[in-house]
Amino acid sequence: MSSIQLQKYLDLLPENAILNAGIAIAGLSAAYAIGLVIYRLYLSPISKFPGPKIAAATFWYELYYDVIHKGQYFHKIEEMHEKYGPIVRINPHELSIRDPDYYDELYVSGSVRPSDRYEGFVNGVVDFEGSHLATVAHELHRKRRKPLDPYFSRAGVNRLEPMVADLTEELVVKRFEEFKGTGKVVRLDHAFTAYSGDIISALCIDEPPHFTSTPDFTPSWFDLFHSGVVTLPLFMGLPWLIHLIRLIPESILAVIDPGAQNWNTFRMMCYDSIKDTKREKGAQPTKDTSLLGRPTLFRHLVNSDLPASELSDERLLREAQVLIGSGTMTTAGTMCFLVYYIKSNPEIHRRLTEELKPIMEGYPHKKPSWAEIEKAEYLQAVLKEGLRLSFGTIHRRPRVSPNQPLQFKEWVIPAGVPVGMSAYFQHTDPKIFPNPHEFNPDRWLSNVTPAMKKNYVPFSKGSRHCLGMNLAYCELNYIIATMFRPGAVDFDLFETTELDVKPTHDMVVPLPSLKSKGFKVKFN
């Protein structure tokens, strides 16, 4: 319609009609907003639960602390619990519980009751729809996770162990010893992200990226996940932004956000691998994957009996992105945390190296197995303390009981209401862990109480516990044992403080201070 024709129709409208229409729309919008607030405050199924009225009325309260204050709503929730008690309403839809005795009641196996994921959480997780992690319904999640479990079980990771051992040797012996005597400053957060990325990629796809062997450990790989995680609170608060961004052509998006190219490169790495695996399947007359090459998770999935809808390129692409992304960043962050506290505490360093002497003797010509490394009691205490204080995730993990209400003390939580608990609260309860913010491996060597074991939840619990738990333990055992064995290459912390490793921001994935210039060490 031309501007002349549009003006013709506008001239036919009564005087002030456009103004009146605008006023009417504004009035209806205001009435809707007021009605919504009244419903949330007084008529909602969770209106009787304690908590600040502003949090019950609007999501903007949470968005303010997580976007403007960069992932600080978990501290606000902590304040709410201090004021209102063990159960609080933290937004219009969701409850938070802080009670060490209730964790095992909320995070249960599928045989106890189904546990759905909170749809509001899933909607803001960028580009992961269709993956097991972003699946809302319990039964569909179970079907999607079942074929993944064997690859991440203890037995599955044991089969992967030789590759983990070889990559550890490549990083710590080949790469780090190149720097011996050079005084070279290295970003360990880049090195560990490359290492973990190579391991999880080798498990999933046929051609891992070999980031560990690149000169500077491919900083763009670290930047890809770090920059993506920083945006998560915004997208979780305003999920419609994701759909808006998808309307922008990739060529324009690359100009607006240069980091988008890293994401596209990652997507294409996953997509190309999946397409190659499908082409391989089409050319192979048998389902025997042992004839196809190195066993990988996605070779197994493509050749499985899953329905065609579960094997679409797009769904498998997103599953690959989730598995590789989540298997890279949190494990690398825990490695940085552990190395910092070991190097910052000479007595911990000394005891650890002394214990590792008989186990790592002859390395790398004689490599100990993961099971042999696990016999080092002090090392296991160090790892547990590192996982306790790096939390896995700080963010509460909301669960929904779709069919039956939950009972918490005198409170009946209606079916369908998302309820979350946080490893941060479980791991920093002073009644369970005295001086909870102190890095003290000795707490795991004597007087270990049942409450300590019960409330140690870096990988969560229940039917949706962290898939990569065994792989993370394997990597942590190998990397710490190898770096701190007697005779390992010597290095010192360089322009690095606790702020560079300590979880400070809850961006769903915990991050250290956003002012950090990276975790750096200098090789002597």
Curated annotation (Swiss-Prot):
Key words of the record: Heme, Iron, Membrane, Metal-binding, Monooxygenase, Oxidoreductase, Transmembrane, Transmembrane helix
Enzyme Commission numbers on file: 1.-.-.-
Residue ranges spanning the membrane: these are: 18-38, 225-245, 322-342
Classify the main location. membrane
EC category: oxidoreductase
Q: Which reaction equations make up its catalytic activity?
A: ophiobolin F + 4 reduced [NADPH--hemoprotein reductase] + 4 O2 = ophiobolin C + 4 oxidized [NADPH--hemoprotein reductase] + 6 H2O + 4 H(+)
Q: How does it sit in the membrane?
A: Multi-pass membrane protein
Q: Name any cofactors this protein relies on.
A: heme
Gene Ontology CC, one term? membrane
Protein's UniProt keywords contain Transmembrane helix: yes
Q: What does the similarity note say? A: Belongs to the cytochrome P450 family.
What name does the UniProt record give this protein?
Answer: Cytochrome P450 monooxygenase oblB
Q: Name one GO biological process term.
A: terpenoid biosynthetic process
Q: Name one GO molecular function term.
A: monooxygenase activity
The pathway noted for it is: Secondary metabolite biosynthesis; terpenoid biosynthesis
**Localization per Swiss-Prot or TrEMBL:** Membrane
Which residues of the sequence carry a binding annotation for heme? C466
Instruction: Provide the function of this protein.
Output: Cytochrome P450 monooxygenase; part of the gene cluster that mediates the biosynthesis of the sesterterpenes ophiobolins, fungal phytotoxins with potential anti-cancer activities. The first step of the pathway is performed by the sesterterpene synthase oblA that possesses both prenyl transferase and terpene cyclase activity, converting isopentenyl diphosphate and dimethylallyl diphosphate into geranylfarnesyl diphosphate (GFPP) and further converting GFPP into ophiobolin F, respectively. Other sesterterpenoids (C(25) terpenoids) are found as minor products of oblA.
SUPFAM superfamilies named among the record's database cross-references: Cytochrome P450
Pfam families annotated for this entry?
p450
Q: Which domain of life is it from?
A: Eukaryota
